[in-house]
Amino acid sequence: MRALEANLLKFLKKSSQFIIPIYQRNYSWTDKQCTQLWDDIMRTGTDGRIHAHFIGSIVYVERALSTVSSQESLLVIDGQQRLTTCTLLIAALAEFFEQHKIPELLNSFSAKKLHNYYLTNPEEEGERHFKLILSETDKDTLLAILKNTPQPERFSSRIQENYEQFQKLIQENQDKLEQICRGLDKLVIVEVALDRTQDNPQLIFESMNSTGLELSQADLIRNYILMGLEPDLQAELYRDYWRKMEQLFGQEAYSQYFDDFMRHYLTAKTGNIPNIRQVYSEFKLFAHTHFSNNVKELVADIYTYAGYYCAFALNKETNPALKETFTDLRELKVDVAYPFLLDAYHTYKQEGLSTDEMCQIVRLVESYVFRRAVCNIPTNSLNKTFASLARNLDKTNYVESLQAELLILPSYRRFPSDEEFLCEIKIRDSYNFARRIYLLRKLENYGRKEKVNVNEYTIEHIMPQNPNLSDEWQADLGSDWQKVQQTYLHTLGNLTLTAYNSEYSDRPYVYKRDQVKDGDGNAIGLSSSPLNLNKNLPKEYWNEEQINLRAERLSVLAAKIWSIPYLTQERLSHYQPQKNTETTYNITDHPHLMLNAAMHTLFQTLRQQILAFDECVSEEFLKLYVAYKAETNFVDIIPQAKRLRLVLNMRFADIQDPRGLCRDITNLGKWGNGDVEVRLDNFDDLTYVMGLIRQSFDYQMIKD
């Protein structure tokens, strides 16, 4: 490897050609990065005290260790973003010089020299004519700019937009052309030439990913897969799989969602959820473990699952029935279910499920998630529930085993029953519910063949929100009208949809229902509404009784829409785990708690406070310690003669312990689970120690 400081323009002039390998990410600099480069150039070109401005490194591979004086094409390993952006700026400047017939500036800036020195190789033809050849997605767009020809049908919007931005900036600063040219002439890079036979481009590439626009996890994965392959295989895999995958996503969606897809893919394949910042590291381990000898099979598998993801997550599904179910699920924003859906969709595509069965599965997930949201069950556990869900299913009876698996989930993972769901949906604040539009849309469109676009309507409170209700409203609601309004205002029974919210305002109920008219005298009251939500409203008054009656009717409908599956106890027992026949323990198996009254009292107080954290916390007495679990163990208590020894299941570096009571037991032999130990022997420290335990509980509940 050889690294040299170089003037950018001189570097471009003496270089024959740069090629962006197919494994590199697409051009991705935005207006923000382009504006920053422009500002740096203008500042540098204006200030005579600034002799150079460093813009980063250009790392390339050549066949032998030499300078760029050789005429071979150079593969760019790092620096394509700044190299491409500078090329766009120079192209825009050359075009302006040519159109406005600008004479040569600073003895080296003219339309001809800008083209022949920095953009093209005048004596070459075909692609060799151009200094910079981008990867497949961007290549034709840049070449169209350099050749001044129309853009292809599928062009790179990022390249075109940034080129137009530079055109605009040059136009706005045409009285400062010398400063622009002088600033360009002061740009400096570090050119890093790698020897293909001695240097590892992948390791160097990873180590240098610290400047410019940060590479995504997906960019790193693509480079990892393709960079080390022979050129022919590299081109084949890119052409047959990766390029098709990019096109399947679309340019913007690929940039926005491919990282998420890879995380869901790894979760589906391994059952473990990678930290969002560790997807690349986890992928390398996965690839080495499962596809170490067959990179083509790996890329083909990613491509296959990417097709599944695009179908349900990016609205690419072609089957009408499935498309509708996926649309509803996306509106719920339950990305955590995607690893499970990847598995289900794979089974579907392998003809292990019919379309109807696949729809049932999606509707079941939708009901499970929505019922939990209505019942305000914490969502912390959903990602782990769906990460491992498919592994527990009988693939020969997928739907029924999924129904059973969801029905037997305990406690905070539970599928809310009809009783719980019906109670909560009637009394909860539905107006300030994040999924209120989804709720009303589904209720309105149940049974409709021609769906209503509820986005054309606004939410109407039948009983108004105004705390200063009119005499008519007070009479309808009765002597406790304030309590009735406070209790039922935002509940489902009092909410509907209308296009005439301003016309209804706070007017009396009978007026809202029957008397309001538009400018042409047409009735536009609730009784004239075409919406199902506005049918069967009472004629004379609106009060607590009527709100409850409507809430009851709508809640029964909701239970049909978001239904819970039914299995006989016999079928359910078939899927329930076998009861543990191992030895069980209880408090009597811990003599230090039974024989020492002080330790017994301290332990009982401590356990009660731990169990009060959340209903999801469970307690298990083991032979040597007592475990407290949420997602996993978060604290284990080891009773001793004079103290309780607590092991917290979190990293020692993450614990906040200003009093310094904790001890680092990482890599030490121990009972319990975790790297943090704290000892408790008196009630004075109980509150402080509970704060430490709470940290471990929160850590288990929120960690990815």
PLM region descriptions:
Residues 218-221, 226-437, 525, 534, ...:
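A cross-family structural signal marking well-folded subdomains
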Residues 596-616:
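Amphipathic alpha-helical segments
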Residues 620-676:
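Short, conserved beta-strand/beta-arch hydrophobic-aromatic motifs that form part
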